[in-house]
Curated annotation (Swiss-Prot):
The gene is CMA1. The active site is at H66, D110, S203. Residues 1-19 form the signal peptide. It comes from Macaca fascicularis (Crab-eating macaque). Major secreted protease of mast cells with suspected roles in vasoactive peptide generation, extracellular matrix degradation, and regulation of gland secretion. It catalyses: Preferential cleavage: Phe-|-Xaa > Tyr-|-Xaa > Trp-|-Xaa > Leu-|-Xaa. This is Chymase.
């Protein structure tokens, strides 16, 4: 199987494409996911792309490192990204903390912290999301949710409105076709018997399990068939804490 680096995933999402779409999901109730962040990214080559992310502190957003770029603007409080509302807060990213061990071949350590130029104002439409402790190892079989503005089908454009889908955490064996899948660093998400998945455009968004962000959308198959691979947040809690404490 051909696996593509995550930057391409944002345009292909899942064989190894960056996961960026919600396939088989439904539209979220407006502003029911106040932690969601929409990232507009200018790449080093000039073209722009988009990713998801989520607010963990008033001045920090957590996302995937394959969403890094020359510059990033974060929109909080959005539901329809084409219709500006009073709830919107557009904030500039002043520093991108990319995980130092990120590997574009294995796609391990696909996690990044974004420091915002200004602190977000917490409102009914903008809020923070809890993330797990280092030793919180979420078990297979758990039903979780992922949200994003990504494609709703392999050949379809990105969604204007925030979409959400329920996905099951799978045993590591379900992701054995991904050559570099590592259960200690990553989560295998999505029942292969179902059509529901995250796809291009959802990259960087959170996997929410019992109210806690356990994973970050990373990559999957080019045809968007589940399961997909998510970064396991609990493994990176010490790294996250170190950056938050120093900034």
């Amino acid at each position: 199987m051909l696996l593509l680096p995550l930057p391409l995933l944002l345009f292909f999402l899942c064989s190894r494409a960056e996961a960026g779409e919600i396939i088989g999901g439904t539209e979220c109730k407006p502003h029911s996911r106040p932690y969601m962040a929409y990232l507009e990214i200018v790449t080093s080559n000039g073209p722009s792309k988009s990713c998801g992310g989520f607010l963990i502190r008033r001045n920090f957003v957590l996302t995937a490192v394959h969403c890094a770029g020359r510059s990033i603007t974060v929109t909080l409080g959005a539901h329809n990204i084409t219709e500006k509302e009073d709830t919107w807060q557009k904030l500039e990213v002043i520093k991108q903390f990319r995980h130092p061990k990120y590997n574009t071949s294995t796609l391990h350590h696909d996690i990044m912290l974004l420091k915002l130029k200004e602190k977000a104002s917490l409102t009914l439409a903008v809020g923070t999301l809890p993330f797990p402790s280092q030793f919180n190892f979420v078990p297979p079989g758990r039903m979780c949710r992922v949200a994003g503005w990504g494609r709703t089908g392999v050949l379809k454009p990105g969604s204007d409105t925030l979409q959400e889908v329920k996905l099951r955490l799978m045993d590591p064996q379900a992701c054995s076709h991904f050559r570099y899948f590592d259960h200690n660093l990553q989560l295998c998400v999505g029942n292969p018997r179902k059509t529901k998945s995250a796809f291009k455009g959802d990259s960087g968004g959170p996997l929410l399990c019992a109210g806690v962000a356990q994973g970050i959308v990373s990559y999957g198959r080019l045809d968007a068939k589940p399961p997909a691979v998510f970064t396991r947040i609990s493994h990176y809690r010490p790294w996250i804490n170190k950056i938050l404490q120093a900034n």
